[in-house]
């Protein structure tokens, strides 16, 4: 069988059926398997909407078919939506029933989880910015407790001196106490500290006596220091144990080298050099151990086609190629073959074992077959790693894996065949009749009993036979009991998380021969502290310094404060080199010697496992997809845990249907190409630095990204004047920081760049997905200027007020009938957004749109001398455009009402030839470290196409649209 057969995909389009309101009511997919190309199955997902156009329910193809015979089968999701579009109740077969209610400012007020846990938020009162003060939690049969407290800085001299005015000073949360001590002008924290909760304590921040709360905390306080440049990039980080990381960047803002100084030691180089292509892709990186990694890309598609890691000629240990991976793709980007030219072809039991993997897909791009090599003595895949083998002393055999899925995308069977090694087996997974919940058949092979292995929120309560799982009130895995003993202490592994659901500690207890061994891990900024106790005696303390910037590689320094193993050098450096999806395949030490080598099956099992010593192998914590592997065999991704032996998540997606109706499916069943960075949604792998969120922001880098909004509002650095004019009310220009929530409601959003999103909360849809996985840095202020209520809104930013190294990004969101005008006059930037009312017969700016723009400009510039009663035609807008030194207009002009000037700085987004066109206007204002200010506007014509329904962020149901840019231009304003 050929790996890619174009005939297989003929006649298998994806079809969306729209109703007369433009809503997708059917999604048709045509399924054909490579083994049975003559058979084709039509799979239909159904969606319904209420009379107001809000989504009311969805059902996937599998449940839709079952519902025809069994009326008790429920849709995957049902929504009850308020008139405002806010989803008040979500009923899901995977994640249960969730209630949520926002306040008048669209802030979370109350939520009730599927397990009956309620959370309540409290905010500042009137005449304050409306920031959150606390979050309370109530479990069934328990008293309500406050699990989060926020204390915000005022404006006294000491706080201003540390740039803390308006910032959160102290945050008591589920992990302990986080404090911000000082912040740079760019927004980068200069010093911050963390004080963990006692192991025996629970977060209960009742009352107002902070001294009483401190009794719940450990006496240890861990403080991290940073020094940043004018662009907000970290130059030096000193971790809580005194280890220092230093970084240097090139003129484009990319990392070029980095160094590490362990506490009390000499500085050593980690990254010698990094080179990049014009597109910003890494071409070559050389590390301090002399190992060189070279990346190659396909010219036409820019897909990664080669990763070569080697000790080059002239290295003190001699030349050696560690890996030379070559990738072959089909036309849509599925990997067909991976060849490792660094490995030799071997022979075992009369079979030829080639160092390559091949893959076959169905018409839905799900992996259905994989060929590769494995260790000849490897047992059936389980939660445990296979027996370790010495390096270069392995016999290999070929394997074939076949994967079978149901029509909802549930992986139901993994059939493993290795004939030469007599190692063939089948892993079956039992899927519930009523949901996408599923467990290994070793737990049950009865589809009617699957639901009993999950709680109401879709969290699995048993891992393997006899291994129980416990979850906390916030839906986080709290405890695994791998061995339960009657009348004796059980083995266990427990976890604790911060307010962002990120793990901050892990404790594993194991009983053996009347002795208790306790292993603890504390996760700090750039550091892990691992300890081992035998009984009450501290036996070992290992500090793992995690290098934040090292190219694509992950680098760790292993420093033993106590109990250093004799076979391992103290302060050993471990460089981990990855593959296309970020899996750690090679570990090399600081002298360029190989420590370990690991190869993986699709979906994450270990096929090859070699190391030079047992102890060094046991210290390897990160493996498949670059994620941490726990003693349970689970991989920790950040928001969820993953079962590699079942190819499934342990719990329903906390982000809802961000990746489809199946909340348990792993990376769309395409694990060779796709990588999930945090357990929420898959994408293509990109190593994210712990120091930087995104490379230097430029106006050109915004092309094709799609409209943006704010996920939640927060304080920003820049001051500016804001004015709005509604149909029945005027608001005079005022500093935006002095506005009440009512003054800015539905018109102005401000936030730091980390809170950027593609989600339009008021319209209940996602304008693409770009910003969901690519947040900006916090040295960028976001300003989203909506129109007034059948009126207009405007802002005036003094460019001199932008601080060096900071940027301001201004947008109107998605323009579907409004006008956005931007311009610079002298040292001031202006943006005017005219609203939509009842459109005129001749133009689409709004009921009084042209006049509103003129009046808004006069509000912001009283001496502008602009006529307040212009002719109501779009050509009149040229008067405003010409008033500015440089400016732009994005408008929606019907045929016959266009602006009669053909210029790059004017965009009519009502262009014929495309459907569902929208306009985008991004203005980027930047001041570099030398104090030079630049201002530019990107004008873009885009299309929003029906793509998916019911993408959700938490409990809020939303529609996902696909954004495609059709044409764009950048206009320099200054």
From Swiss-Prot:
- Phenotype of gene-disrupted mutants: A double yenC1-yenC2 deletion is no longer pathogenic in C.zealandica larvae.
RHS-repeat associated core domain as annotated region, ranges: 600-680
Q: Which SUPFAM superfamilies match?
A: CNF1/YfiH-like putative cysteine hydrolases
What is an example of a Pfam family matching this protein? Answer: CNF1
Each RHS repeat occupies one of these ranges, namely 165-179, 290-304, 322-336, 354-368, 398-412, 490-504, 570-584, 596-610, 630-644
Q: Which UniProt keywords apply?
A: Repeat, Secreted, Virulence
Q: What is its main location?
A: secreted
Q: Mind telling me which NCBIfam families this protein's record contains?
A: Rhs_assc_core
What the protein does comes down to: Part of an orally active toxin complex (TC) with strong insecticidal effects on larvae of the Coleoptera Costelytra zealandica, Acrossidius tasmania and Adoryphorus couloni and some Lepidoptera larvae. The TC has an endochitinase activity.
Question: Would you identify the family this protein belongs to, as annotated?
Answer: Belongs to the RHS family.
Q: How does it assemble?
A: Semipurified toxin complex consists of at least YenA1-YenA2-YenB-YenC1-YenC2-Chi1-Chi2. The Yen-TC:K9 subcomplex is about 26 nm tall and 22 nm in diameter with 5-fold symmetry and 5 copies of YenA1, YenA2, Chi1 and Chi2; the chitinase subunits may be solvent accessible on the exterior the complex. The Yen-TC:K9 subcomplex has no insecticidal activity. The native complex with additional YenB, YenC1 and YenC2 subunits is 16 nm taller and is insecticidal; the toxicity-conferring subunits are present at about 1 copy each.
For this entry, the protein name equals: Toxin subunit YenC1
Q: Which organism is it from?
A: Yersinia entomophaga
Gene that this polypeptide is encoded by: yenC1
